[in-house]
C-alpha cells in the first residue's frame, strides 16, 4: 500500500464558489451526519469567508450556525477548518488588530480547529500576524499561498514564500489554487521543494476546477508529497467548484496511494439533501454559468466563481455601453463581444496594478477596475477615471505589499490627487476599535454573547449586523427570494401578487410584479424622504454607475446635508456596485440644495442624486 492521502470536504466553499448564499443552520445539522457517514473525510471546511457574513445577509445568526455545524464533526473525530483573509478577517476590508485577536478566540470557542489564513497579496506580514493570533487562541495555523501565474509568480517565488511562512510559525501550508490556473508540473515542483526541506509540514491542496487543470494538478501535488486534498461532491462538484471526491479517490487509488473508501449510500443521501437545499432557496442564487468549466479563464486568470458575477456585471452595463456606442454611430456589442473586451482589459490592468493574486478581494478589484476602464473608454473618456477607495488602498500599499511594481501612469495619478504610497506594516493603519463597538452594544442594549461572539460579529460586519438586528436583512432577503421564485414560476396571468413576509413576528407587505426583476424590499424602519425639488439653475450630481446609493461608507462618517457648501471634486456620496464603494464627486462648487435619493436606494447610471447651486 502506498502513502496515505486524506480528503477534506470544502462544504462552505462548494456554496461560495457556486453562488451567493450558504445553507441555514437547520439544513447544515441535517446533512452533517451523512457527511460523517460517508467515512472518507478527515476534515470538513465549515465556515469562514463567505459564511458568517452571508448568514447575516439573510437574517440569521452565524454564531449559532457555526456552533451547531461544528459540533457533530468534533464528536465524530473529524477536524473542522475555516477560511480567513488575514488582515481582512472575514470581510473585504482591513480589520483592527483587537478584532482580529478576538476573531480567533471566538472561532476556537465555537468549535473550529484550523484556520486557513491567506493574504490576497501574499504579504507574509499579514499572514504571520494571523498565525500568531490563531496559535495564541489554540488553533492550528494553516498558512496559505495564493497561486497564480505571471512573470512574478514563479516556482522560485512560491518556494521563497513557503520559507517565510514556515519561519513565521506556520503549522501547515495550504496551496490555494483559487482560480484553478496553476500549472500542474509547476505546482508539483513547489510541493516537492517544501516537503524536501520541511518533511513534517502538512500540505493541503485546494484547487477549483473552472479552467480544467485541477485533476492533473491534484495528481502532480500528490506525487510530490501533498498530504490532504480538498474535494467537493455532487451536485456542486465541477464547474467553478471543486473536483468530486469520487473521481479524486479513484484517480489516486489507481496511482498507488492509500485513500479511504466512500460509503456511496451516504454520499447519495448527502447529494439528495444538498439538492433539496438548492431547491429550497440556494439554487435561485447560483448562476447557470457557474456549473460549467471554461478554459477562457486561463488567459485572464480570474477565479471561476466570479464568472456569474462577471456576466451579471457585463449584462447590467451592456445597455449603457451600447447607448454610448449608438451616439457615436458604432455598432452595438453582444455580451460575448464585451466579455472579450473585458478579458483584454484585465490583461492590461493586472500588471499595472502590481500583479495582485486574483483572489478575494483583489480579484474583484482588478475585475471592477477593468470594467470601469472599459465603460469610460467606450464613453470617450480616459482610463483610471473611476477608481474606488478600496482599489486605491490596494494600489497604495494600505492592504499590503504588491508582488509587482505599480505602473508610472498610476503613480502619477496618485500624486496628482494628493495620494501617498504606504510602505509600513498595513496593520498600523487600523487601530483597535472594540471599545467603540462595546459602547454601541451597550447603547442598544445588545448582549455581547457567549465568548463575546455577538460583539465580534458587530465589529467584523458592522453594517450587516445592524441590518440583521433590525430585521431589515431578513425582510430584504425574503422579498428578493419571493421575487426570484415568482419570476421562475412564470405565472401565466402575470398579475402582481401581494405577499406577507413574517420577520421575527413582524409582518411586512410585499408586492411582487412578475414582469419586474425584483420586488420592492420592505423597510424595517421608515427612511427619511428625499428633499423637495428646488427651482432655478442647479448642477446635477449624476450617478456614474448603477448600484446602491449611500451618503457615507460607514456610520462614523458625516453625510452631506442640504445647505452644506461643497467644492468641485469633494466626495458627496457613494455608489455600492460590484462589492466596492465608488465615490461620487461634486461636479461643481456650491451649496447642496436638494438630495434626490435616500441612502440604500437602488439607482441607475445617470440618475440624479443631488443638486448643487
Tell where the protein language model's regions lie, with residue ranges.
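Catalytic cores of alpha/beta
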Residues: 157-161, 212-224
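Glycine-rich phosphate-binding active-site loops on the catalytic face of alpha/beta enzymes
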Residues: 177, 224-241
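Structured functional modules or segments
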Residues: 533-613
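Active-site beta->alpha loop and helix N-cap motifs at the rims of alpha/beta catalytic domains
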Residues: 33, 48-161, 180-183
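Terminal or standalone catalytic/regulatory effector modules within metabolic enzymes
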Residues: 36-54, 289-297, 301-527
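Conserved, mostly hydrophobic/aromatic
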Residues: 14, 117, 173, 225, ...
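Hydrophobic faces of well-ordered beta-strands that scaffold small-molecule active sites
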Residues: 6-13, 42-46, 78-85, 115-116, ...
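Core active-site phosphate/anionic-ligand binding loop and the adjoining beta-turn-alpha structural block
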Residues: 216, 241, 249-252, 256-320, ...
